[in-house]
Amino acid sequence: MKILSAAPNTGNNICPTNSGIFKPAKAAVKDIQLAVEKLNLADDLLVMAGDNVLDFSLSKFVKFAKEKNTSCVMCHEENELKKQQKTAIITLDGNDLITSYEEKPKEPKGNLAVPPFYCYRACDVKRIQEALENGCGYDAPGSFAAWLSKQAPMHAYVMPGKRYDIGDINSYEYVKSVFSK
């Protein structure tokens, strides 16, 4: 599995949008497509967007995706309506299969929020152009997952720990204090 990340990194198989490997399209879904084309990627992909710090390993998420043999998203419980309205919300059946996927819903059907962490099967990555031609948004990284969930079975892995979104200096300072203990 290859890893695509929008945050700067130095790993061998990580392709940040500011890496100089390609000029970003300034639209997350198009950036994924561009990286796949420029790097000639034909493998399953782990895609992550945003400035996040996790207190858990991603290895179980990747294992889950391989076991389910579908593209997968990660999710966590979010019970605050205002936060639900600013993110993707999904519902699941008893086997973790996504039954609905809404981007920034005014009236959410569920309470499982989807951060920008996705495992895409290689066969699904090949469908990005089809998605873009059929109404998938170009910008938000979750647009492709939302579109794909209506085209093919997708599963969701419940986040086993905490995710810290570093959106400003205050959240950065908070995360520093959490991890320095």
Which residue stretches match the model-derived regions?
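Conserved beta-loop-beta/alpha segment of the NTase-like Rossmann-fold superfamily
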Residues: 4, 11-93
